Amino acid sequence: MADFLGMMKQAAQLQSKMKAMQAELDQIEVEGLSGGGLVKVRMSAKMEVRGISIDPSLIKADEREVLEDLLAAAHGDAHRKAEAAMQEKMQALTGGLGLPPGLGLG
């Protein structure tokens, strides 16, 4: 019974740490770039897009398709960086718990 209570206490602590980590992830901001920095996407580590910046040289009617491609690439770059930041935080949180690799608590 003591083991069960210990597990419940550990689960409650983990839940508290997860809430704190979610708040930290909201504060982490990454920036994805494409076109040599002509297009930038800012995103939180919670995968929320915070802003998009487009160099004025790209805002031409005949450059629309290029701009769309660059936006998609910048978003993908920001998403990868946000995912890496989230994984880093999750590893720090769950590293001492002895969980099997790839459990996927994130």
From Swiss-Prot:
Cellular location(s): Cytoplasm, Nucleoid
UniProtKB keywords: Cytoplasm, DNA-binding
Top-level taxon of the source organism: Bacteria
GO cellular component: bacterial nucleoid; cytosol
GO molecular function annotations of the record: DNA binding
Classification via Gene3D superfamilies: Nucleoid-associated protein YbaB-like domain
InterPro entries, alphabetized: YbaB-like_sf, YbaB/EbfC
One family name in Pfam for this protein: YbaB_DNA_bd
Matching NCBIfam families: DNA_YbaB_EbfC
UniProt similarity note: Belongs to the YbaB/EbfC family.
Database matches in PANTHER family: NUCLEOID-ASSOCIATED PROTEIN YBAB (PTHR33449:SF1)
Subunit-structure text: Homodimer.
Function text: Binds to DNA and alters its conformation. May be involved in regulation of gene expression, nucleoid organization and DNA protection.
Protein name: Nucleoid-associated protein RPA0616
Organism encoding this protein: Rhodopseudomonas palustris (strain ATCC BAA-98 / CGA009)
Upper taxonomic lineage: Bacteria, Pseudomonadati, Pseudomonadota, Alphaproteobacteria, Hyphomicrobiales
